[in-house]
Amino acid sequence: MTKEKPSSTRVAKTQALDDLIMGTNSSSIVSKRSVERLYYPNELHFFRYFVNKFQRRAPLINRGYWLRLRAIDVIVRQFITTPEPGRRKVVINLGAGSDVLPWQSYHRYGDSCGDTLFIDVDYPDLMRKKRAIVLGTPQLSELLGEDPYVSEKETDHLLLRSDKYCQVGCDLRELETLRKCLESFLPLFECSVLFVAEVSVTYMDTISADALIQWASYIGQAEFCLLEQILPHGPDHPFASTMLKHFNKLNTSLKSVHQYPTVNSQRSRFEKRGWNSVDVWDLWEAWNSEVFLNSSERAALDDVEPFDEWEEFILFARHYIVLHATSYHRGGKGAGQQMLASPPGKHVKANMVATKSLGAPKRRFGSPLVASSPEGGQYLVHTLGMGINARLDSCDIYSIQESSTSLEMAPVGPSARICHTTTDLGQGDLLLVGGRASPSKAFSDCWVLKKSSNSWEKTFDLPVPLFRHSTVNLPGSSLALVLGGKTGPSEISSDYFIFHPVRGWLKCAVSGVSPNSTFGAFAIASTSLGSKNGHFEGLLAGGIDGEGKINNQAYFWTVDVTTHEPIIHFESVQNYDQHSWALSVFGAQTANIESLSFVCGGVGQDPSSQGQSMACLTVKGKSLAVHLVDLGEKAGQLPFMVGSATVSSGSQLVIVGGGATCFSMGTFWDTGVYKIDLEGVVSEMIPGRTIHNKPVVVGYQNSPKLTQPTTDGVYPGPQSNAFITAIPKIKLQSKSDFEKLVQNRKPVIIEGLDLGGCVEKWNSEYVIQSVGETKEVVVHECQTSTGKMDFNSKNFRYVTESFSSFMTKAARGEALYLRALSEEKPTEAPANLAEDFPGLADDFRLPEELGSVKDRMFSSVLRISGRANMWLHYDVMANVYTQIQGSKRMVLFPPTDVSHLAFAPGASSSSLDIFSALDTHQLASTNPHEAFLNPGDLLFIPAMWFHTASPVTDLSVAVNVFFRDLESGYSTGRDVYGNRDLAAYEKGRQDISRITKSFDRLPSEIRQFYLRRLADELLHE
């Protein structure tokens, strides 16, 4: 019976899949070329010949590929250099692609290679391309010797043969074809053969991959080196799900990973298929193993490029294994996961409620704090951190109690950063310490958030810049203890500091044992009643040390602040191994409920700790109790506590944010909100203790931006409210009167003007009829209950409404706002009332006294709003604002107030809530001018005068006319809104950027010294 011939459709599908798998080679080789160029500057480079253009990869990808390459290289080196008398050594690279293992091995190990033969096997099309590059590149063809065999037939599987290197074009599923080809030029059963499969057989269907593994075990004296993905916590773990989606999107799904998802299942896979000795490591174990690299080699990597993506690197390494199997028995116990931490013996059960995204922006590696409003509302504030594209200069504000009013925070504060800490100082303030921009730019500035006013004040700078440090409040005091952290790309702080709100930073003298210097550790302060005045105690654990390994020690600390120089004393935790699963973690967050401390997430030395674990710790004196907090078993429903924010409220924890870059496969963002009820845990751990909880109801409010102060010192300034000047009202007699107003550059309200019939006619019904009920308009819909719109935090959304629906909602005071755009070309041309709303145009006119406005008009804008506050901003062009219907309160500030109004560099809008701030000391250094506009009033707003508006009535209708009051100097190019800054300013910003970059190579303090001097020169010009 003849074998059925595959259908052409099936063959085409198979070929298409094969082509996609071959495509994965290109990305991998570009990454390996990046590693080769950066990390091996003193070696000959071979990947370069297979990559048309060098692309520097991100540090995370570089380090991950470096580890992959090192793992393979070590096993190949061991094979090559181990004596095997009477047997020729053969290295067969299965799915070799454009890999350069033969050339690297002969270059690195020279004579040790002896007569080792390297054979690359992959799809015929890919091997033919590789053959052409090898033959056409002298640096590669040199390995072939003088007379290599080169096949001439398309059907040949042996494409290239020489004494040291061969190429075979063969589908790895065709084992009989592969065997015949190899045996045609090589007595396999007389050889020592090492098969290498680096992320290749995982693309094969599992049956074919297993058949290949079993077949290989019978080839001579065989060894096998496998490197591929695993799913240690299942397919729903955030890293795993991102990885699987990535390969599925490429149509190159990982096949065997579901059947062999763990280290042990991979070991069993090989043991059942003829391999007598099997060693398996996940790549994090390989990173820690002296088999693959030593401490000095790990540390040296930091000198190549700054690196701080440790959580993401560990997650990557936990999801890959390197396996070394031999068909003969080697003796000894299999290497790999042998020294696991003791499993947790004590469990406590928590109740968790997960909520999908509440609309907050994506944020990770920020730091949380709990703030209060004057009305007593409680709020989780997730400060700064990393967003989708850059570090963020904003904070997410969540209410954590039902019916909370909005939290108003002053907008001046710390700059964008990650890896900082925020700590509640008890009855005092909230302290923000350090952080970084890039790993090469650590910050030493510190800030306090005043609980009474929710305003930031700059406080004492750290003695050294720090990020990835630990900070704890010393219970019952307004002091904070800072431990460890990094001061730069590779420098770890060995110092301990006390923050004193009056004396500043105090360096501690150290006694007792000397802890390893670490960063990313966690610290706990004990609240035991035995603490004496001025004496405090706690625990320090986890973090990464100078060798690039997670610290395997924990320490009890005691601090004495009663002496002039504080003293910190350390003692080792004696039963560490019993609790190492909870203590050997990096990047964990801590939160306290009563005397219990909860260590949340991070990644650990134990394989169980991959961002979804939680432990409950109790520290009292030199005793430590540890319990695993059971959150459930479904990884897809658990919070991903990597770069997340955790706070406590009563007996509950609230967790927001978090995420990780999953190597080269995309970024996972946890946008959920998690409430973890620990009331049962508290009752179990602290008998007789009951916590009376207020219900925790989490609601996202907004994400206000923070701007940096323009001068040094503590904020706010003078302790008095700003004096408000009433804007004068006048009547014009002639055109020249208005020209004088323009030249004087001061705001005025002009009364008694003939604006046409608009003031009498433009009620809701008339406007709807004139514009058209069904005409669609795009309006701002405020997302907060206060109606206070903020352009920077975008706390509004753009919605398309019929004009009738919009007017109805605005008339009843809903927080909607229409700023009309050009009807024909909204992205290209400025608004023009006559063209955009012809049904209304005849009712509105500018009187003769404002003839110069008509002559130099840039745009005329219809503005209609309900009860929505317009954000503080300035316009580059002068304008007249005519109130047609309703009433509005407007507050203006002169251009000289720019440094006091929280405008970020280059921004024309501020997040400062003027109408709230006027009742506080916050605007004491400003000069506010106020206008109440009624129908028929016209407000002249000079260029660069900052202004904001608040409705007095439910509905407001106005026409705003912008005009050029300068003869020249405006920016060229498209300017729909008329708010592009003057050309001289835009050019000046470019010049400043160039000047700033010219100081980049200088030490931070010298750089700041000279930049401040240049700033002084600008101010004195």
From Swiss-Prot:
Q: Which UniProt keywords apply?
A: Methyltransferase, S-adenosyl-L-methionine, Transferase, tRNA processing
Pfam families found in the cross-reference section: Cupin_8 (PF13621), Kelch_4 (PF13418), LCM (PF04072)
Show the GO MF annotations. Answer: tRNA methyltransferase activity
Q: Which residues bind S-adenosyl-L-methionine?
A: R68, D122, D171, L172, E198
As its record notes, the protein acts as a catalyst of: 7-[(3S)-3-amino-3-carboxypropyl]wyosine(37) in tRNA(Phe) + S-adenosyl-L-methionine = 7-[(3S)-(3-amino-3-methoxycarbonyl)propyl]wyosine(37) in tRNA(Phe) + S-adenosyl-L-homocysteine; 7-[(3S)-(3-amino-3-methoxycarbonyl)propyl]wyosine(37) in tRNA(Phe) + S-adenosyl-L-methionine + CO2 = wybutosine(37) in tRNA(Phe) + S-adenosyl-L-homocysteine + 2 H(+)
EC annotation from Swiss-Prot or TrEMBL: 2.1.1.290, 2.3.1.231
* Biochemical pathway: tRNA modification; wybutosine-tRNA(Phe) biosynthesis
Q: What does this protein do?
A: Probable S-adenosyl-L-methionine-dependent methyltransferase that acts as a component of the wybutosine biosynthesis pathway. Wybutosine is a hyper modified guanosine with a tricyclic base found at the 3'-position adjacent to the anticodon of eukaryotic phenylalanine tRNA. May methylate the carboxyl group of leucine residues to form alpha-leucine ester residues.
What does the sequence similarity comment in the record state about its family?
Answer: Belongs to the methyltransferase superfamily. LCMT family.
Q: What is this protein called?
A: tRNA wybutosine-synthesizing protein 4
Q: Which organism is this entry from?
A: Gibberella zeae (strain ATCC MYA-4620 / CBS 123657 / FGSC 9075 / NRRL 31084 / PH-1) (Wheat head blight fungus)
Q: Which gene encodes it?
A: PPM2
